[in-house]
């Protein structure tokens, strides 16, 4: 059975980032005992770089003579690692072993909670390009991994905490080279463990490039805090849009990057953002949602509150000090109880959850904000009862019965050879959905059954009716179109909005405005009925389970004799578990939750048996 990681980012309750220099074995043992009792069995830990490698330069006649340790002694190993700190980390692992806790080790911890942690002699050097800094990073990583690779408590090696935050963004080449140096150094010493990213903020076109990182790393990580994520706070924390952020971003990494991905940091940013009760509900939805949608696990930030710590970063960053699962005196917050309950569910049910069935492929195109548009499409699809797989238009497009091209923009939508392949698949029977944001496709009328008459960049919107519901729309550019073979599904007095066209054996849906782009920065957008557009696209998809409520997200996980189905309430209201089953299946067992009513932010897990 594949284990789903249930964990936390750990700093000792008494000292925070000073835990290694202010070591207290008794407190650390009490911390880990407390966390373990609450089903927290994985800790991400951070050997602070300048504490572990306290180097000091010595000069003669204006030139560097040698490096020693900070206390003026000669190094006791070729890596300039402090033996006292190494012994403390060894003892830390001993304690973890006592309680059956595994550890993800963040190696180059030069950044933490807004503070730079770099050895003093290296502070004026670029950590990504300076030869001296790179030498000491390589020595640190090599020495640390050599020292502890035999320890069974270590689950994986993490590059370090958000290493892409240590300095301003380098070029793509520099980001690649730095990642390769650290990863290859780890692998040269220990090839038995995964190397995980430790970073968020990877993108298709940026310096920290998702394809480069996929080439070098074994596991991606996401840190999808709504408070910090772009467009993450447009809606309330407890809205379906925000509740699906972590799931969508993690799925984006898995599908586009082609590697497993761990939700390595998640949290609410404390009681000034939401109540502790809401934080627990937020965690509960995300535990079930990330588990059901293919994540390696989910880890909270962080273990204990740090209000009592009066040094940087805690004296700087007021948002950092109330993020714990518990108070420093071991008073458990509701979120810790949520993690314990979810751990009990996994331990008792012993579910080996297969991969969820995917209903469509969303092709992310050039000249768009791919991650944000993908997220919007993901939420709309969930509300319409479908689950998406992401891909990027320059890479191989997975086989599917349904494809989405959301909010296409600009003259360079996608490579022509990829478009030709897609068009052929549609002609042979697939369904294609296109929404327009001034994107240009050749032979557009032939593909869509819609002819463009004119175009302008004026902001012209309006409303239309679909399934008896009024839907508002807007755009920053307008295509004036007429039908040349398509069927108009939706139109108003002024224009045609939504069309359907038989293309060969397939079907093409065209939406004459950028629904997904519009939603990126629009508050409460998902409260409306716009998801009905997606419901049209998925009307004929084959499903084992269908939910009639837009706030109930369903994943179906086929098994040898049936399926496991996870039904998640992404809302703050009770909803009837209003589902329909394919005639070939019956409910064999309710594993978790209530089959009649799903409470706010709760989930129901059922086992289905195939009878035909």
Language-model segments: residues:
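A short, well-structured beta->alpha microelement
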Residues: 202-203, 380-398
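Aromatic-rich peripheral "rim/lid" segments of glycoside hydrolase catalytic domains that contact
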Residues: 303-359
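Alpha-helical scaffolding within the catalytic cores
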Residues: 27-31, 139-145, 202-212, 243-253, ...
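Catalytic-core region of carbohydrate-active enzymes that cleave or remodel glycosidic bonds
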Residues: 179-194, 211-215, 219, 234-305
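Active-site clefts of carbohydrate-active enzymes
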Residues: 12, 162-172, 224-236, 247-283, ...
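Active-site mouth of glycoside hydrolases
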Residues: 1-217, 279-281, 309
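Short, charged N-terminal beta->alpha structural module
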Residues: 180-182, 190, 357-384
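A conserved amphipathic helix/loop scaffold
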Residues: 410-612
């Amino acid at each position: 059975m594949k284990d789903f990681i249930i964990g936390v980012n750990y700093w000792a309750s008494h000292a925070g980032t000073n835990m290694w220099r202010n070591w207290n074995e008794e407190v650390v043992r009490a911390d880990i005992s407390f966390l373990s009792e609450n089903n927290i069995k994985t800790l991400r830990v951070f050997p602070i770089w300048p504490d572990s490698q306290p180097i000091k330069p010595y000069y003669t006649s204006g030139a560097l003579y040698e490096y020693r340790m900070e206390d003026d002694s000669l190094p006791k190993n070729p890596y300039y690692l402090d033996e006292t700190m190494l012994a403390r980390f060894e003892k830390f692992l001993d304690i973890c072993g006592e309680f059956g806790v595994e550890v993800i080790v963040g190696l180059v911890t030069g950044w933490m909670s807004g503070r730079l942690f770099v050895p003093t002699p290296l502070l004026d050097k670029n950590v990504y390009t300076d030869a001296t800094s790179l030498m000491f990073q390589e020595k640190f990583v090599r020495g640390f991994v050599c020292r502890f690779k035999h320890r069974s408590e270590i689950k994986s090696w993490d590059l370090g905490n958000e290493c892409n935050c240590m300095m301003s963004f380098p070029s793509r080449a520099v980001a690649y080279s730095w990642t390769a140096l650290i990863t290859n150094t780890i692998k040269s010493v220990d090839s038995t463990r995964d190397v995980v990213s430790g970073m968020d903020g990877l993108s298709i076109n940026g310096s920290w490039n998702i394809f480069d990182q996929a080439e070098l790393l074994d596991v991606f990580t996401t840190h999808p805090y709504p408070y910090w994520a772009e467009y993450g706070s447009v809606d309330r924390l407890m809205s379906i849009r925000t509740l699906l952020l972590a799931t969508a971003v993690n799925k984006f990494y898995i599908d586009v990057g082609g590697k497993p991905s761990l939700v390595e940091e998640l949290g609410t940013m404390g009681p000034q953002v939401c109540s502790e009760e809401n934080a627990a509900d937020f965690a509960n939805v995300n535990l079930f949602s990330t588990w059901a949608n293919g994540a390696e696990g989910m880890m909270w930030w962080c273990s204990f509150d740090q209000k009592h710590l009066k040094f940087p970063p805690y004296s700087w960053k007021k948002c950092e000090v109330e993020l714990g699962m518990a108070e420093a005196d071991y008073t458990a917050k509701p979120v810790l109880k949520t993690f314990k309950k979810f751990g009990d569910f996994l331990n008792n049910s012993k579910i080996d959850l297969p991969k969820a069935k995917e209903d469509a492929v969303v092709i992310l195109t050039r000249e768009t904000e791919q991650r944000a548009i993908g997220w919007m499409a993901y939420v709309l699809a969930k509300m319409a009862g479908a689950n998406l797989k992401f891909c990027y238009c320059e890479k191989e497009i997975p086989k599917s019965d349904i494809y989405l091209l959301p909010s296409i923009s600009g003259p360079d939508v996608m490579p022509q050879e990829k478009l030709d392949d897609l068009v052929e698949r549609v002609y042979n029977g697939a369904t294609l959905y296109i929404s327009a944001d001034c994107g240009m496709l050749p032979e557009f009328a032939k593909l869509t059954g819609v002819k463009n008459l004119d175009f302008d960049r004026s902001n012209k919107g309006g409303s239309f009716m679909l399934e008896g519901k009024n839907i508002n729309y807007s755009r920053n550019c307008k295509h004036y179109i007429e039908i040349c073979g398509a069927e108009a599904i939706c139109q108003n007095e002024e224009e045609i909005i939504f069309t359907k066209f038989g293309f060969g054996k397939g079907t093409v849906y065209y939406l004459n405005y950028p629904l997904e782009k519009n939603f990126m920065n629009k508050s409460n957008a998902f409260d409306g009925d716009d998801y009905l557009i997606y419901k049209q696209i998925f009307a004929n998809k084959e499903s084992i389970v269908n939910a009639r409520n837009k706030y109930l997200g369903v994943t179906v996980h086929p098994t040898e004799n049936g399926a496991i189905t996870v039904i998640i309430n992404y809302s703050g209201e009770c909803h009837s578990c209003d589902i329909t089953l394919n005639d070939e299946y019956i409910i064999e067992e309710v594993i978790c939750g209530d089959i009649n009513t799903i409470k706010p932010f709760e989930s129901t897990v059922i086992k289905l048996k195939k009878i035909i």
